[in-house]
Amino acid sequence: MNRLTADDLRQLQTHAPAAPACRCGVGACDGWVSLSPERWPAAQMQAIGTLRDMAVHEPSFEELHPHGTRYESPAAPVAPHFYPYNRCTLYRCADCQRLLLRYTEAGGYYVDERVRELAPGLPVLGDRPL
């Protein structure tokens, strides 16, 4: 799968529609939301690429919030080298053209799919780790 950079994400954002109505069932996801596999419309999702560095066996769990945001905040920036973005695949909905970041949250006793829209205007931080 194609590895995406911060510049790639910004370029894709410039062509993404702003909050379109969609029948895909994903719903609003301006911050990270839990989405069961049954609700993920796999048939209409097109994988665009990954943010994961396949050369790194275990990506970092360190988060980056330079403006005091938190993981679940809709204003939290996309930081490709930091958690959870360093584990994400980017998809495009074939119906509404929305861009969606998705990763698997794996805890001790559960597995949870998380989704967040890569909306136009969402800050995307640089490609170099700080």
Each model region followed by its residue ranges:
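Short, compact, well-ordered microdomains
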Residues: 76-130
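Short metal-coordination and nucleic-acid-contact micro-motifs, chiefly zinc-binding Cys/His arrays
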Residues: 15-20, 86-89
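Short, intrinsically disordered, charge-biased short linear motifs at domain edges
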Residues: 5-15, 76-84
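Short, charged low-complexity linear segments at domain edges
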Residues: 1-6, 50-78, 124-125
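Short cysteine-rich clusters marking metal-coordination/redox-active sites
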Residues: 21-26, 93-96
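Cys/His-rich zinc-coordinating "finger/knuckle" motifs
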Residues: 29-32, 36, 100-103
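Short cysteine/histidine-rich metal-coordination sites, predominantly Zn2+-binding motifs
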Residues: 37-50, 106-117
